[in-house]
Amino acid sequence: EMSASLVGSEMCIRDRSVTAYGADAESAVSDAIAEIERLDALLSTGETDSEIYKLNQNGGGSISEDTSYLLERALEIWKSTDGCFEIGIYPLMQEWGFTDGNYKVPDKETLQKLLPLADSSKIDFNEKNQTVSFEQDGMEIDFGGIAKGYTSGRIMDIFREHGITSGMVSLGGNVQVLGCLLYTSPTPRD
């Protein structure tokens, strides 16, 4: 659903919302939605055509500039948090049912088997060649802890490119704003 007026444009799809105010608001929102869809298709763990899905299935491969940037940042955060931020957690997320909604508490034996897979030190990343490989069979990554922030940052860049001075993006509860909301009615209740 998309609505536009002289002052702004807004689009809501599933749990995502993009709002922009300014002369080029409609085009900015359209470009923002296209970027959200592009990054989602690239970074999704569940879409069989996504780069991350293919990396997880093949244990590595060549990656795009966006994925390379996110992997570099994720590994930096992993190091700076002494491993508390871990992108190699995907096998554990699957076992707990977070990926398909079939939640369960795994038994201790299964968890002990999967825990060694959640270890970013076993990710071999060649920044120059934009390639990655997992040193341990069964490793899989998930950018869920960093991708929405990256995506909303890209939306803010798009807004600025379109001269937008006020806007908002909400991606499944992660919200980023630019400028301030411009009220067009005398009171907020009108």
Which positions does each model-derived feature cover?
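Short, small-residue-biased leader/transition segments that mark boundaries at the very start
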Residues: 1-12, 186-190
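Internal glycine-rich flexible loops
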Residues: 23-26, 30, 42-182
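N-terminal cap/recognition module
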Residues: 9-45
